[in-house]
Amino acid sequence: MFVFASFLGFIALILVVQLVRLAIIVPSRQGGERLALAKVQRGSILDRQGRIMAITTRLQRVSVWTPSVTSPEETVRQLAGTLGMPADSVLNILSSHDGYAVVKQRITPEESAALEKLRTDGKLSGVKIEDYYGRFYPQGHLASHVVGYLGADGVALDGIERTYNDALAPPPVSTDTDPAFGDQVVLTIDLDIQYITDMIARDAMQAQKPDSLAILVMDARTGEILAYSALPDFDPNEFQQDSPRIDPDALKNRPVTEAYEPGSVFKIFSLSSLLDLSVITPLDRFNASDVYEKKFSSREVIRIHDLAPYGVITPQQIIEFSSNVGAAYASDRTDNESFFNMLSLFGFGKPTGIPLQGETSGLFKPVSQWSARSKATIAMGQEVAVSAVQMLAAATVLANGGILLRPHLVRKIVSPNGIVIKELNREPLRQVVSSGTARTMLSWMETATLPAGTANRAAIDGVRISAKTGTAQEASRKTGTYSAENFVASVMGIFPTDDPRYIVYVAIQNPRGLQYYGGQIAAPIFRSVALRIVDQVGIPRAGTKTAIPSSEQEAPPPALPAAIGDTMVDLTGVPKKLLLPLLLRKDLNVTIHGAGFVVRQTPAPGAKIEPGSTIDLELR
């Protein structure tokens, strides 16, 4: 796959060489305007290794001077067959023009050769093959939402093409013979990693059939975005046609323009805030055996549930098991203002400044607009809306010792003669939490990749992974209620834990498969991407899974079995991954049959449990 991207880059390099040659020696068949077209060129867009993602080069199109057509039916038939167009479309083009008509832009060399032969044989009177200069995107769909596109008229319409139009566009020329070239824009994108994420994203789109899917990869040390896969996407070459065949939905750049409730992934930021405020410690305990419930004088009642009773748990286990109840109880330790101020430092409620159009600020309401339930629900990732890029940027805090970095898509701007005009380096914005808090959260996230953790499918043997999954119900803007069918499944992964180099964020909007939890479908996608990166860049892998240091924990915290005391609890609906700690109980004989969720159990809820008791669980 890496050879594929490099090969495309090599082909594009040949085009550059050809372009320079053409700009010098192309003769003018139509006077000075033709010469100016050859000498005034828009700058190229390159990936971080210098591989071409956008370039202005010589192209060909088919035109017809309709008064010279002697056999209309034969001309339509030959053009349609050679160009792969419906005959009706060709006929419509010719019949709607009294004189000059362009039938197709950007024809291939094969189409050009076939048409030239037909012209030589006298079968296409009035048909011409014309050279012109246009924008070519040799990588096609890859990172198309980043690169953007020009319209057929050469106007920059989206992406880096539009944001950096002043740099890419050549300066005005005073005469037809003055050469003018635009600057080159070098992106942070790595086409090798981009190809990996695109391939994995397309497989996931086919399997899960979601409305959209995003995989973003960032260099954790610099804030540079290495891959930006946002599906559905498009081929920017289509816009060089007079009538581009583009699904409008594919043009939506969702990672920057759309905001959604992040769900449980947000707990890594809410608990980091509480930890840094010193209102919780790693040794605290929260009772997640039952529902979190609060009644207020306003008669408002809050009830927050977990998938299963987790017993008395630590803050680390709130992350490991993704306990909503635990997160809600932890949020009770602070006031609204302090909680809001800490989370605001992560960048929520504000645009990141990424150089793409239409960036959303998300939604993080001021405290004056909070209800009695807001603090508890925000702690678990509801009542706050974020973009995928905001989540990626916020994660830099955990990967950089508590410092927030600005996300980058552009590395540098280079003049036509190779001089670096501007270089965009690592940009620290502010210290959000202490380095100790950041390290602690990474260690808590690492426990989520253990067998009982919600991110266990993100684990890679021999590589320390910190990850947190999320599953958020979509909120209806009309009714204010949560959908029972539409979800956003996501995962945030940072690795290696002890020396973060990469941040990967995956968000899947409204998956339509049998599974929809972030731990079920987003975590495996992260693992696939991370595995390829580990192999690609040569991250060392230990022979066995590295043990998690627990210097912050003086005593091992209780796991799920703590929820089972003298009486049997109701485990109906509990997923298998949350049952695994029961197998470690030496005082119980636990048997698990099947996979999925508990549908039947023996003994029944409420039965007395004694040492040596047998517990039989059937899953489907």
Report each predicted region and the residues it spans.
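Periplasmic/cell-envelope proteins involved in peptidoglycan metabolism and beta-lactam response
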Residues: 1-241, 259, 337-350, 358, ...
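Beta-lactam-recognizing serine transpeptidase/beta-lactamase-like catalytic domain environment
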Residues: 54, 220-264, 269-508
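Conserved SxxK-family serine transpeptidase/carboxypeptidase catalytic domain
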Residues: 101-122, 128-141, 145, 149, ...
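Flexible hinge/switch segments at interdomain interfaces of large molecular machines
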Residues: 167-178, 363-368, 553-556
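Bateman (tandem CBS) regulatory domains
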Residues: 177-183, 248-255, 564
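BRCT (BRCA1 C-terminal) domain core and associated BRCT-interaction motifs
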Residues: 590-611
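Conserved "repeat-terminator" motif of extracellular CCP/Sushi domains
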Residues: 609-620
